[in-house]
C-alpha cells in the first residue's frame, strides 16, 4: 500500500518536470564552463535531446535513473516480466509494481529506438545518468563528457589520406632533365 494519500502522490508526480531539471542544469553549467556551446531540447531531432552540440554532431541525454531504468534488467528466464534491480539508484515501487515495470520497460525501449534513429542520421549520443552527477562523481563525469566530445571531434575531423592508384612501370619513367646518352 502507498504511504502517501492519492492527492499527495498526485501533487508529487505533478511537480516532476522534463526540462531544466537539477541534473540537466549541472551538465549544462559544467559544459558551458569548459567552453562547449549547445542548443536545448532540439524539437526536430528524435527524442528531443536535452543538449545538442551541432559542432560535434552529438546529442546529450540527461536521464533520471528511475524514469529511464538505469541498471534495471529483465529476467529472461522467467515467463513473466520479472525485473531485477541491480543498484540503489533505481528502486521500483512495491505498490502498482506491474504498472511501473511496464512504464520503465517502454521508456528504455523508446530511448534505445530514439538513439538508433539519431545514429542512423549521423549523430553521436551520450547518456548521462542522474547518479553520475552526485557530488562525489560529478567532476569525473563532466571531464569524461568533455573528453568524449573532444575525441568525437578529432575522429570526425582527422585528415583523410587518399591512396593513389598504382602505375605501370612504363608510366613511371621520368622525363630527363639533362641530355641523354651521347654517342
What kind of region is each of these model predictions?
Residues 1-127, 131-183:
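Nucleic-acid endo/exonuclease domains
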Amino acid at each position: 500500500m502507498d504511504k502517501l494519500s492519492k492527492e499527495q502522490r498526485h501533487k508529487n508526480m505533478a511537480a516532476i518536470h522534463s526540462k531544466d531539471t537539477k541534473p540537466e542544469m549541472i551538465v549544462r553549467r559544467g559544459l558551458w564552463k569548459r567552453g562547449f556551446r549547445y542548443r536545448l531540447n532540439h524539437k526536430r531531432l528524435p527524442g528531443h535531446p536535452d543538449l545538442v552540440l551541432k559542432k560535434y554532431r552529438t546529442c546529450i541525454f540527461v536521464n533520471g535513473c528511475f524514469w529511464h531504468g538505469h541498471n534495471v534488467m529483465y529476467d529472461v528466464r522467467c515467463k513473466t516480466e520479472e525485473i531485477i534491480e541491480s543498484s540503489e539508484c533505481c528502486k521500483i515501487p512495491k505498490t502498482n509494481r506491474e504498472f511501473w515495470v511496464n512504464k520503465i520497460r517502454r521508456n528504455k525501449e523508446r530511448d534505445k529506438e530514439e538513439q538508433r534513429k539519431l545514429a542512423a542520421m549521423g549523430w553521436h549520443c551520450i547518456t548521462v545518468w542522474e547518479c553520475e552527477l552526485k557530488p562525489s562523481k560529478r567532476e569525473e563525469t563532466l571531464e569524461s563528457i568533455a573528453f568524449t566530445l573532444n575525441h568525437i571531434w578529432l575522429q570526425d575531423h582527422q585528415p583523410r589520406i587518399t591512396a593513389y592508384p598504382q602505375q605501370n612501370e612504363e608510366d613511371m619513367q621520368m622525363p630527363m632533365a639533362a641530355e641523354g646518352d651521347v654517342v
